[in-house]
Regions:
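N-terminal acidic, glycine/proline-rich low-complexity segments
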Residues: 1-249
Length: 249
């Protein structure tokens, strides 16, 4: 069984939360080096807090969480509170995190990790706008050749967009960052809306999480119930697409 050294770059988001929990529940497959927060679904102040809330929910206070870029490279931040609620994790109430935020900036952590590990041994799982990753590539171009691969949720090929008729949210928020990453030469696995709109939740699956009777199971059920209302209203689907967990899977 392959064991992957991973940095998760994220803007939590209920579906980001499920993705992070999946990674934390897979220690035999994933060696999680750290979680880097970026502004996206909600502002950075909330995404870095949400990342720590998720780790504490899983009982993983040992995970290092880093705060990154608070706005896109060249434009104003667009957020998605209309989907994720004002906190980004609306749907259930969880306590303010007690675990510390790391002092080093997320961009510097990405650079440090890539320069101080054997080349092409680190996978970056990108769940949000690509601002942190592109900023690392710009700040120290040496790291580009050291990335094993990037698996990212973003874009839409034949599927309609989820922020404009043509655009997917993560790419739309920072297209300049996306251009840097897509033109970098790093091996990319892109998971667009064409894929994630086929990975839908269902009442049966949501209730299976709730039936676990654990804090994680309850939170996942409540988050999913909140999150799926947007897609039910917009697309008429029977459940919500689990965009970001597809990256970890």
């Amino acid at each position: 069984m392959n064991h992957h050294r991973v940095i998760i770059d994220t803007d939590p988001g209920q579906d980001d939360a499920v993705a992070i929990l999946l990674a934390l529940a897979s220690p035999k497959q994933i060696d999680l080096l750290g979680v880097t927060a970026v502004a996206g679904n909600v502002p950075l102040e909330l995404t870095q807090k949400n990342a720590r809330i998720i780790c504490e929910l899983a009982g993983r206070n040992d995970v290092k969480v880093f705060s990154g870029c608070h706005e896109p490279i060249e434009r104003k931040l667009v957020t998605a509170e209309h989907v994720h609620g004002k906190t980004g994790l609306d749907g259930t109430d969880l306590p303010y995190p007690q675990m510390p935020l790391q002092e080093i900036h997320a961009v510097d952590f990405i650079i440090h990790s890539l320069l101080n590990n054997p080349t092409k041994t680190i996978t970056i799982c990108a769940l949000g706008p690509l601002t942190n990753i592109a900023s690392a590539f710009k700040k120290d171009p040496r790291v580009v050749a050291r990335v094993k691969n990037i698996i990212l949720m973003g874009g839409a090929y034949f599927e309609v967009g989820n922020i404009t008729p043509a655009a997917e949210f993560n790419i739309f928020v920072d297209p300049e960052a996306a251009k840097i990453v897509f033109e970098s030469g790093v091996v990319l696995t892109v998971i667009p809306l064409d894929v994630t709109h086929k990975a839908l939740t269902s009442v049966k699956r949501v209730e299976a999480f709730r039936a676990l009777g654990t804090p994680v199971g309850k939170a996942v059920a409540e988050w999913t119930n909140f999150f799926e209302r947007f897609d039910k209203e917009k697309y008429g689907s029977m459940g919500a697409p689990l965009h970001d967990p597809c990256v970890i899977a």
